[in-house]
Each structure stands twice: as structure tokens, then as C-alpha cells.
Swiss-Prot record:
The keyword Thylakoid does not apply. Keywords: Antiport, Cell inner membrane, Cell membrane, Ion transport, Membrane, Sodium, Sodium transport, Transmembrane, Transmembrane helix, Transport. The chain crosses the membrane at residues 12-32, 65-85, 103-123, 133-153, 162-182, 186-206, 214-234, 308-328, 333-353, 377-397, 412-432. It is found in: Cell inner membrane. This is Na(+)/H(+) antiporter NhaA. Na(+)/H(+) antiporter that extrudes sodium in exchange for external protons.
Length: 437
């Protein structure tokens, strides 16, 4: 899951979030193979409910959501909302806002999705039970991969960070489309119709100048419930919600600066012995606060608000309930699915991203970005194999409780492929990037 705001500002957050994800995943694996494994499984299967009168918000198909279902289908909607906000911003003003900017990362991402699927299918043929996991190695974890890249500090050219971020965003778009198209059950269109009407309502309310984020989120919860009942995976509701969040601020920067200057010029001076603000001073400060809120668009404001919750709560919880790989028990721990996923992430991502980038540049379709070369592209192509979050998510959708042995194999493949890709990518970049003077 971050994209271009200021790469330097987010380096520290990416590193911390990546470490937290890694530690949480290790903790889950340790607990799942310890005497506390039964407690861990009970936690995952614990049923939840949120009742308002006779209505239970956390119910689906006649049963309460379990803890793992609530996290995967509920809390992960917040993650996908943030992903949607990032995608929308990149499409409007970022690295996907024009063909010139988007061409190379788009082509690289296509290679990074197609080749892993081909490699997976060579190990687990489509049509078999294992073949259901074809889409697992398609994804790149933005936060995790940028976190590893950030460990190299100022040695990394900004263009390389932009390239990694942009092709990971395109990967996310591909992953979202796969989830929406291939991992939806029987569709109940009446629920989707109500959800569509609410989206249209939010769109026109936003066009009329509404900026209350709480209102959009409350309606978003209603839409999430409708998706949960519809058969379309509920996390998709978060992505679509992002596209009706207003992206235009109420004040432009020029007007904001003029207003702040005027407020400061008329700000009452403090008395020599005063330590408490006067009512007039408080009123002026509230004007500053109001103007500052209006110069930030709801899209950017909500995205900023969600980063902390997603990176330090939602994703660690997701890792904890999904990374509990069993190293013993019924069935093969390491099987064809493990190999297919690990090879897809490690070899497939590298070959796909590197070869498609090479073809795009050598054919003259798009130029090589300033500050990048084939050596550091090879390192970033390896980092593209850090699948983790979305790969684990798709693994659960592919196999779920119906195929616990294959799901366990897929999780082991995701974890091993991610770790190897992260280590190799870091080492390659450490060797090829110029040393700091």
C-alpha cells in the first residue's frame, strides 16, 4: 500500500511501518506454531456483532462476521479507500496524469503482472485447485517496498522512488480489477443498485461544495454493508468511494495567503503580562484554522488522516491474522503453490518489470528517466517482488477456508518470496547506487 507526496517526508514512516509489518507477521507465525496456536485460531474465528435494534451491521449470509472476516472484509476496506485516494491523486496531478509520465511505469507494471502469472501457471496449471491462486504474485506492496528503498537514504535518486511508486500504483489498479472481476460470488443486483444511488448522491453533494469527511465516511459504511450483501467483494466499495471524494479545495492557495496575511495584520497584540488569549485573538486564530481547513481538499485531508490508522493499525492487524503460517500439521507444508507464488514474486516480478522496461526504452516508446540506469532498475525490479499485503489478501480470496493446506502453502510462498525479494533488492541497490560523499 504510500505514493508521491514528498518522498523525503515519508521515508521515516515507510521504514517504521515496514518494520512493524514484518515484526507482526513473524509474531503471527511464531504463535501459530506454539502451544498458543489454539488460542490464536479461536481469536480468528471469534464472531463479532454490532447491533442497532434488531439490525446487525456485522452480518453476512445469515451469520456474524468472524474476527478474520471483519479484518479482511471490513478494516481492509479502509486500506483500499486509501489506495483509491492515492490512485485518484496520481491520475489527477501525479505520475499517472499524462501519457508521458505514465507510459514507463504502466508498461513496467504490466510486465510485473503478466510474467508472474505465466510463471505461476507453469508450476500450477490453470484448472487445478492450485491454479486458483494465479493472481497471488501480481501485487507489489507500496509501503513495504518503499520502506526497504528508504533504508538506502539519500543514495536513491528521486526518479527511482517515483518509478517504483508509480508502477506499484498501477499494480494496485490491476489487483483491484482482479478482485472485483474474479473474486466475486453470486451478485445481488438490488444491493448494488442502492450502493450506486448513494455513490451518485455523494458525487453531486461533493460537486455542490460539501467537504464534511465524516458525512462521506458514514455514507461509506452504509455502502460497505450493501457491497457485503451484494456478492461483490466489500473492499471494492472503498476504492469507488475514493473517486467521489472531492479533490478540489474550497480556497486556492493565493486566496488563502492573502486571507492569512490580512488576519495576521489585524491580530490583536499581546499585553506585556498577559498569558491568556483574549476573545478577539481566539476569534482570529479560528479564522486561520477555518481557512487552513478549506485550502486542503477533502481528498488530501482524508488521505493524510488515514495514513497513520492504515500503517499502524489496519495493516499490522491484517498481517497478524493472515501471516500465521503452519509449519506442521495435515498436508504438505511446502508444495507446488508455495513454489509457484515464491517464484512468481521473485523471478516473475524481476523478469517482467525489467524486460518490459527494457523493451519500452529500447524501442523508443519512452525515454529512460533522468537519474536511472539499468543497474538500479534491476534492484527496483526485485523490490517489486515484495507482494505481502495484497498478495496475502488475494491468497485468502483464492483458497480461503475451503482449501486450508493450499492457503497455508500460498502464505508461505508470499512470505518467503517477499523476504527474498526485499533482501536481494536491497543488496543489489546497495552495490550499484553511488556511495554518499
Amino acid at each position: 500500500m504510500t505514493v508521491l507526496r514528498s518522498m523525503k517526508d515519508f521515508s521515516s514512516m515507510n521504514i517504521t511501518a515496514s518494520i512493524l509489518l514484518f515484526v507482526t507477521a513473524i509474531a503471527a507465525a511464531v504463535i501459530a506454531n506454539s502451544p498458543a496456536a489454539s488460542v490464536y485460531q479461536e481469536f480468528l474465528s471469534h464472531e463479532l456483532h454490532f447491533r442497532i435494534g434488531g439490525f446487525n451491521l456485522l452480518s453476512h449470509a445469515g451469520h456474524n462476521l468472524t474476527m478474520i472476516e471483519f479484518i479482511n472484509d471490513g478494516l481492509m476496506t479502509i486500506f483500499f479507500l486509501m489506495v483509491g485516494l492515492e490512485i485518484k491523486r496520481e491520475l489527477l496531478v501525479g505520475e499517472l496524469s499524462s501519457f508521458r509520465k505514465a507510459a514507463l511505469p504502466f508498461i513496467a507494471a504490466c510486465g510485473g503482472m503478466v510474467v508472474p502469472v505465466v510463471i505461476y501457471s507453469m508450476v500450477c496449471a490453470p484448472g487445478t485447485e492450485g491454479g486458483q491462486g494465479l493472481a497471488i504474485p501480481m501485487a507489489t506492496d507500496i509501503a513495504f517496498s518503499l520502506g526497504v528503498l528508504s533504508l538506502l537514504g539519500k543514495r536513491v535518486p528521486l526518479s527511482l522512488k517515483i518509478f517504483l511508486t508509480a508502477f506499484a500504483v498501477v499494480d494496485d489498479i490491476g489487483g483491484i480489477l482482479v478482485i472485483a472481476i474474479f473474486y466475486s460470488s453470486h451478485v445481488a443486483y438490488e444491493y448494488l443498485l442502492w450502493a450506486a444511488l448513494l455513490y451518485v448522491l455523494l458525487y453531486f453533494i461533493g460537486k455542490k461544495g460539501a467537504t464534511n469527511k465524516i458525512f462521506f465516511l458514514v455514507v461509506g459504511v452504509v455502502i460497505w454493508y450493501l457491497f457485503l450483501q451484494s456478492g461483490i467483494h466489500s473492499t471494492i466499495s472503498g476504492v469507488i468511494l475514493a473517486f467521489v471524494i472531492p479533490a478540489k479545495p474550497q480556497l486556492n492557495v493565493g486566496t488563502y495567503i492573502e486571507r492569512i496575511r490580512r488576519i495576521i495584520s489585524t491580530f490583536p497584540e499581546m499585553g506585556a503580562n498577559n498569558i491568556v488569549l483574549t476573545n478577539q485573538q481566539i476569534a482570529k486564530l479560528k479564522e486561520v484554522e477555518s481557512a487552513s481547513d478549506r485550502v486542503i481538499s477533502p481528498l488530501q485531508s482524508l488521505e493524510d488522516n488515514l495514513h497513520g490508522a492504515v500503517n499502524y493499525l489496519v495493516l499490522p492487524l491484517f498481517a497478524f491474522v493472515n501471516a500465521g503460517v503452519m509449519f506442521s500439521g495435515e498436508g504438505e507444508v511446502i508444495g507446488g503453490v508455495t513454489l509457484a507464488v515464491a517464484l512468481g514474486l521473485l523471478a516473475g516480478k524481476f523478469l517482467g518489470i525489467y524486460s518490459f522496461t527494457w523493451l519500452a526504452v529500447k524501442s523508443g516508446l519512452t525515454p529512460m528517466p533522468l537519474g536511472m540506469n539499468w543497474k538500479n532498475i534491476s534492484g527496483v525490479a526485485l523490490l517489486g517482488g515484495i507482494g505481502f499485503t495484497v498478495s496475502l489478501f488475494i491468497a485468502n480470496l483464492s483458497f480461503g477456508s475451503a482449501h486450508p493446506v493450499l492457503l497455508n502453502q500460498a502464505k508461505l510462498g508470499v512470505l518467503s518470496g517477499t523476504v527474498m525479494a526485499g533482501i536481494l533488492g536491497y543488496l543489489v541497490l546497495h552495490w550499484v547506487l553511488p556511495q554518499r560523499r
